[in-house]
């Protein structure tokens, strides 16, 4: 049976896992790492780079490198420009997913066509749809979109059997924050509530350090570096490193030599000490935001901290001591640590993939919609149809009427959010139901139906109960893509994949040619009298031809000249091998003759020595 990949598509890092032998196993990437930086770049030669290689070149090429694209998923107006080409967030995310898919296929030795992808619990409909679109562009059939905290609970609770317990999952990732309350027992994972902030994560903690370093450098040197992209990239990398170090030590030194050049032409260096206390002080308001979400989630679940049985920390940012202390103080419980915060979400996604594929039995996942869904009604009021924290999939209907006499149509304005005024909520889409027969206001019966699938994606319909006429839409805008757009992007992605493959082959062809030139030149030096002058001149000419071919870009010409050089070198290499073989045989014969001479017996001139045995007792 074909494998279904479980993917944690993270803001700063991504991870993938698969079910093997009844267990979820994390798949390392091509570089051997268990997580992959969610970074995409294009080299100055136009080569697409994803993961660690993209992150490594970001300092020298910041304008063609993209970080944290997940924060812009679902934003229809956001694009990034790389090497003069504009890309939507879905396309950048698809490049990351393609990298994971390709590496997984190489590891497993089979083609991957299906996946379960996780998203923050607080992602809205547009963000979820954008994630699904990214999977499609990458060539993946996304079977399910599941919430990250819920996925982590699967990783934690799969082996807990029939033990009933209430758990809080605190998920602070690179760019998003979620907290979910779940009830586990008998193989059922039921989400009771969720809360969070899709614009809060480890990146924000890094940015506070960057702001501090910019301010200190301005104070010391009088230079503002806030507009220098290359410098900002170096500061961001240093900030992330400092944040990680401060999780284990009380103080760290941030040293960046040759950061910039002053007006006098002298290089300027940055050398600043940062203590854990300073870091915690500059980020305490960020932690306070997570506390607000924890209170909200518990309130919605109608629970108190004392009702919790376990607290699970997920996401790399939860390694910060201040986070652990905050959660422990609020809940009164030490966080459960027998789970890798970087890998738990991907493992849970693989388990859900196993459920969908029939490999994992007796597990039922009951998730919720994070935000209230409704429509705009008379006076600009937001009227809810499905309250937040409703278990999904679900379907709700409500009957509305016209606001004016003889109104021929109604516009259905679909909203997501908690505000009472329509304009303060997120618009998911609009559509019109036409053909309503003339009637006084309040008489026509318009039934509006909201249907949320297991992915948390909304479908809306409106029906005139009097005429039976109906209209429906699957919410995709803003931020979603049409089928035509997805098809175009899939083709673009496939084209890029072919281009990348060809570019890689071209590089390998050049590398092989250069290696052969070095080997051939070495062979000429060592050949001596093993080769004729005619043979040597042929090799020299072939080397010159290949060097000339390398000055151009015609790979086929390089391959042809490489083969010609191999043919020219072969006779010399063969002659040298034969000569070395003859010399070795002669040496063995010489050793054999010397050995037989030694075995003839002692020389007659050698005199054997007389000896006498002395009795020690007599000596005494």
UniProtKB/Swiss-Prot annotation:
Family stated for the protein in its record: Belongs to the heat shock protein 70 family.
Region Disordered: start and end of each range?
Answer: 577-620
Entry GO MF terms = ATP binding; ATP-dependent protein folding chaperone; unfolded protein binding
Gene3D superfamilies registered for this protein in UniProt = 1.20.1270.10, 3.30.420.40, Actin, Chain A, domain 4, Substrate Binding Domain Of DNAk, Chain A, domain 1
The UniProt keywords, alphabetically, are: ATP-binding, Chaperone, Nucleotide-binding
- Which residues lie in Low complexity bias regions? 578-590
Q: Any idea what job this protein has?
A: Acts as a chaperone.
CDD domains cross-referenced by the UniProt entry: ASKHA_NBD_HSP70_DnaK-like (cd10234)
Which PANTHER family does the protein's record reference? HEAT SHOCK PROTEIN 70KDA
Per UniProt, the ranges with Acidic residues bias are: 605-620
**Disulfide-bond pairs as recorded:** none
Its gene? dnaK
Q: Under which name does UniProt file this protein?
A: Chaperone protein DnaK
**Do you know which InterPro entries this protein is assigned to?**
ATPase_NBD, Chaperone_DnaK, Heat_shock_70_CS, HSP70_C_sf, HSP70_peptide-bd_sf, Hsp_70_fam
